[in-house]
Amino acid sequence: MVSLQKLEIELQELFKQKQYSKIIFEITSQTEDEERSSSLCNLLGLSRISNDNKNKDSLSMALRDFKQGYLKEKNTNHAIDCLANFITSSVLLIDLEKNYKFDFSEIINFYALTEKFCINHRSINLAMAMVYRRLN
């Protein structure tokens, strides 16, 4: 088993260098789903959508990563970042698929569970604005 903290630091440097494919390889080859921290899940999801042109498959895989990261820690800063990216990526996928009858209840429930931790978190509030705009 690899030291997750050391891996996170190394991968953050790779992310700054925009080496997304390498990040995806390192995370998926050195860790199992259940041992990844919210931070690693977030980094993996961001790398998946930054590596491609936001196609359906990369967005779907990133959504799984973001959701997993949020559910692991719920009220940490990394989990809130995962939730913001989960919401934004969901909206991007909905727009890509032109799925205008999408059920936003899961997103709204996740947000409601963490709302008091998200009050000053700009990215999640912008993401929720995207959701509410699509509901009207």
Indicate residue ranges for each PLM-predicted region:
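Alpha-helical segment of the N-proximal tetratricopeptide repeat
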Residues: 4-29, 33, 49
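Heptad-repeat amphipathic alpha-helical coiled-coil interaction surface used
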Residues: 24, 44, 51, 70, ...
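Short coil turns that delineate tetratricopeptide repeat
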Residues: 35, 74-77, 119
